[in-house]
């Protein structure tokens, strides 16, 4: 019997043909080459139901785009941080120990508040 505990990658560009989509799919392919199942999705959807349904996940990689943290649009920054905080909270409520990684540009990591960074297992720099 084979147990499958995939890594979930959440990126709005996962299926896009732009540079971001190509980059996240390259990461996905590299993980799969190591023998780990990867499931790519394009949005968080309903946060609580997604976290509950994905109880078999072994880890989450959450992609954050630099555009979401454009300092000229503080409302967008606040919204992106709120959504990220809520999703991580739902994951931690379901499983306090599941590894969570952020994937994004190095400069984007500067905008992530410390309370979110403490919940992460790492930041994958693109």
Predicted regions: what they are:
Residues 60, 84-114:
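A short, hydrophobic beta-strand element within the central beta-sheet of small alpha/beta folds
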Residues 9-13, 60-70:
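Short loop/turn segments at strand-loop or loop-helix junctions that form parts
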Residues 40-42, 77, 101-126:
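Output/docking surface of receiver
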Residues 40-59, 67:
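Acidic, metal-coordinating helix/loop segments flanking the phosphotransfer/catalytic sites
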Residues 14-22, 68-82:
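Short, flexible/disordered intra-domain loops and linkers
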Residues 1-37:
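Non-catalytic signal-transmission and effector/linker regions of two-component phosphorelay proteins
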Residues 27, 80-87:
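A general structural detector for well-ordered alpha-helical segments in enzyme core domains, enriched
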């Amino acid at each position: 019997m084979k147990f499958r505990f995939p890594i979930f990658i959440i990126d709005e560009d996962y299926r896009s043909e732009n540079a971001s989509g190509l980059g996240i799919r390259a990461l996905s392919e590299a993980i799969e080459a190591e023998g780990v199942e990867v499931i790519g999705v394009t949005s968080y959807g309903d946060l609580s139901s997604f976290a509950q349904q994905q109880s078999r996940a072994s880890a989450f990689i959450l992609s954050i785009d630099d555009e979401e943290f454009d300092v000229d649009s503080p409302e967008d920054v606040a919204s992106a941080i709120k959504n990220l905080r809520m999703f991580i909270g739902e994951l931690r409520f379901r499983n306090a120990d599941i590894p969570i990684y952020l994937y994004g540009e190095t400069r984007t990591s500067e905008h992530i508040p410390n309370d979110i960074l403490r919940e992460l297992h790492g930041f994958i720099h693109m």
